């Protein structure tokens, strides 16, 4: 093993979860600007492509039958139904990035994060909550870290720190903010 390998943090999946309106996407944009090597999976969906979306960039657009085939084959790490459409995270590209040593940041809702925990118990779950709100105790216990989104810069900096962390998560939950 080289010195470079020893200095590099072990690749890990970090799930940034929060309720609708918590600002997950804003935080992810700020994190990507600070930590360009982090990989953010492109979600798969059965909804039609909208202009100016490009297949494989903003979303991977799948026919409903293809989505079902991938679910049956275990190729979706997690998935959900939103209205008449489905969306999910393709597992093979995510696994390939982790196996290659790349840090992965996956923004999801709380339900999606819990589904990831079942399939990948070593994933680091980070709960993002809006200012002035406290997470439900039952929800908070599933997460290693809780961040209050009162300042996108601060939250992004803390998340970048977690992404670069080589140590395992503490057994206790941290509430910041």
Where are these regions (language model features)?
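NTP-dependent small-molecule kinase module
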Residues: 2-4, 138-177
